[in-house]
């Protein structure tokens, strides 16, 4: 009897549940089961990923501005640059010749100097230079493929001016290039007085008479600029009646200068540029200039 009950219990364990048992524990459909909700820390990570935005930005270009020109209009000695070539220096002396004497000298120069309009050569093209010139010196002088023949016949007024400049500056000169700017249309283009016959670091004394014209300078660009003068240093110097300007040191090696055309009417102007020419450039001395005040 006991064995029958035990077998019935074992068989009942594998039997299909009764209706009452099925109703007591209804099966839960899979779709109605609650889903797992992420915790606060994981939700914040998802939010950070959703907030990320990748915005493309155009590459920014480096803007280079050309420097403002430096204006020199007062008496003094100015070091305008320092390079491996040396110090570039200009000395400005307004009123070196007083107005009354300067008026008389201007008249003498306009009348007595043998002015001539010479032909220049640029890129194998010949053109009339936009100014009149004259040369004084024992030796010829060649610049911009134009040769000035020797002319030892100095006018007394020119010799007197040369001696006065030498006495007051301590420099000596043996030659003179004269330029006559007839009006605002006459000019001289960018150049350096760096001909081999002038030696290294030549000293140029420029004495002006007549209408005021602006003397402009620009520094020669470094090799990496490939000859582009856009961003170089610049200097402007107004040269008045009777003003003396000295350029010395490495100025001709490191800088260019010009007298540009003017947009407004200008009267006549004569510029005398004293210099030293050597028969053999190999024997020319180097830079011996110093900051010599006007005596």
Swiss-Prot record:
Binding site for substrate: 115, 141-143, 194
Segments for region (Disordered): 1-48
Modified residue annotations for (4R)-5-oxoleucine: 177
Regulation: Activated by ascorbate.
UniProt GO cellular component terms: cytosol; mitochondrion; nucleoplasm
Subcellular location: Nucleus; Cytoplasm
Catalytic reactions of this protein: an N(1)-methyladenosine in mRNA + 2-oxoglutarate + O2 = an adenosine in mRNA + formaldehyde + succinate + CO2; a methylated nucleobase within DNA + 2-oxoglutarate + O2 = a nucleobase within DNA + formaldehyde + succinate + CO2; an N(1)-methyl-2'-deoxyadenosine in single-stranded DNA + 2-oxoglutarate + O2 = a 2'-deoxyadenosine in single-stranded DNA + formaldehyde + succinate + CO2 + H(+); an N(3)-methyl-2'-deoxycytidine in single-stranded DNA + 2-oxoglutarate + O2 = a 2'-deoxycytidine in single-stranded DNA + formaldehyde + succinate + CO2 + H(+)
Primary localisation category: nucleus
Cofactor(s) annotated in UniProt: Fe(2+)
Presence of the UniProt keyword Oxidoreductase in the record: yes
Family of this protein: Belongs to the alkB family.
Function: Dioxygenase that mediates demethylation of DNA and RNA containing 1-methyladenosine (m1A). Repairs alkylated DNA containing 1-methyladenosine (m1A) and 3-methylcytosine (m3C) by oxidative demethylation. Has a strong preference for single-stranded DNA. Able to process alkylated m3C within double-stranded regions via its interaction with ASCC3, which promotes DNA unwinding to generate single-stranded substrate needed for ALKBH3. Can repair exocyclic 3,N4-ethenocytosine adducs in single-stranded DNA. Also acts on RNA.
Protein name per the record: Alpha-ketoglutarate-dependent dioxygenase alkB homolog 3
Organism, scientific name: Rattus norvegicus
């Amino acid at each position: 009897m006991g064995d029958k009950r035990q077998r019935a219990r074992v068989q009942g364990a594998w039997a299909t549940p009764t209706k009452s048992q099925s109703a007591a524990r209804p099966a839960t459909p899979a779709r109605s089961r609650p889903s797992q909700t992420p915790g606060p820390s994981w939700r914040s990570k998802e939010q950070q990923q959703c907030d990320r935005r990748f915005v493309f930005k155009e590459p920014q270009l480096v803007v280079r501005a050309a420097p403002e020109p430096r204006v020199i209009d007062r008496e003094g000695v100015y070091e305008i640059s320092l390079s491996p070539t040396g110090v570039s220096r200009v000395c400005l002396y307004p009123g070196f010749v007083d107005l009354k004497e300067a008026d008389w000298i201007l008249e003498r120069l306009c009348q007595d100097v043998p002015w001539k309009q010479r032909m220049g050569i640029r890129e194998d093209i010949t053109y009339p230079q936009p100014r009149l010139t004259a040369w004084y010196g024992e030796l010829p002088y060649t610049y911009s493929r134009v040769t000035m023949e020797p002319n030892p016949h100095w006018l007394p007024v020119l010799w007197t001016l040369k001696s006065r400049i030498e006495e007051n500056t301590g420099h000596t000169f043996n030659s003179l290039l004269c330029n006559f700017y007839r009006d605002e249309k006459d000019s001289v283009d960018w150049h350096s007085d760096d001909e081999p016959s002038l030696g290294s670091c030549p000293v140029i004394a420029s004495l002006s008479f007549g209408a005021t014209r602006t003397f402009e300078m620009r520094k020669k660009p470094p090799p990496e600029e490939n000859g582009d003068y856009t961003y170089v240093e610049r200097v402007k110097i107004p040269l008045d009646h009777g003003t003396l300007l000295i350029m010395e040191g490495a100025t001709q090696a490191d800088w260019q200068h010009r007298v540009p055309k003017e947009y407004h009417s200008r009267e006549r102007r004569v510029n005398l540029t004293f210099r030293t020419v050597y028969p053999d450039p190999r024997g020319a001395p180097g830079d011996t200039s110093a900051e010599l005040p006007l005596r």
